[in-house]
Amino acid sequence: MEGWQRAFVLHGRPYSETSLLLDLFSESDGRVRVLAKGARARRSSLKGCLQPFTPLLVRWSGRGEVKTLRSAEPVSLALPLTGSMLYSGLYVNELLARVLEHETNYSALFFDYLHCLQHLAAQDASPEPALRRFELALLGYLGYGVDFLHCAGSGEPVADTMTYQYREERGFTASLVVDNKSFTGHELHSLASREFPDVGTLKAAKRFTRIALKPYLGGKPLKSRELFRQFVPAANLSKPTSSDK
């Protein structure tokens, strides 16, 4: 790769005694795996900056699947994520590491990711709206096109008071059936606008994104969800702001 580009570390693990194997999310090349040689050495200048949520400028080289990291510089301090916001950030990172194609440009998604982290770092009352907006944006970039505003059967605009059944590869059709794949027209309007004014629309958005992301994630559970369940105090798990992602 010629020149520098912006990137974040999605995930890293030790490689040999002194190196790190990193999954990066870069502005121009999307998800890239790099080997950071000597990054774990005691005197390495990279030791402190190759952490999740730290905005970086990076350069790498190589033609294989694993590149060699040549340089990395922090653009600023790491975004301050703590508590449920930290686990939410880890969830977003794991999601990207699992579903993004290798070395594919997602430059617009890069900024959606940055905005999501900034919202989480602002320590708002709940991470849920930012997570749902990001998931919906991600689905769009993955090619998961859904028309939330029209009935797939009739083509008519959805009505707030009617119920619609979601069917994969078809969209939403008017239905009297009420189950996990049923959504009101009011909820569909919220999904289309990515604005969630109440608990009901937030829960509906979570149901939809879980249904839609399942084919991309397969049967393997997300580790960040399990970490959240293990380490967040049980009292918080019942609160809307601390529900598993």
From Swiss-Prot:
Signal peptide: none annotated. InterPro entries: ARFGAP/RecO, DNA_rep/recomb_RecO_N, NA-bd_OB-fold, RecO, RecO_C. One of its GO terms (biological process) is double-strand break repair. Transmembrane segments: none annotated. GO terms for cellular component: bacterial nucleoid. Keywords: DNA damage, DNA recombination, DNA repair. Pfam families: RecO_C, RecO_N. The keyword Zinc-finger does not apply. NCBIfam families: reco. Involved in DNA repair and RecF pathway recombination. HAMAP family: RecO. Belongs to the RecO family. This is DNA repair protein RecO. It comes from Pectobacterium atrosepticum (strain SCRI 1043 / ATCC BAA-672).
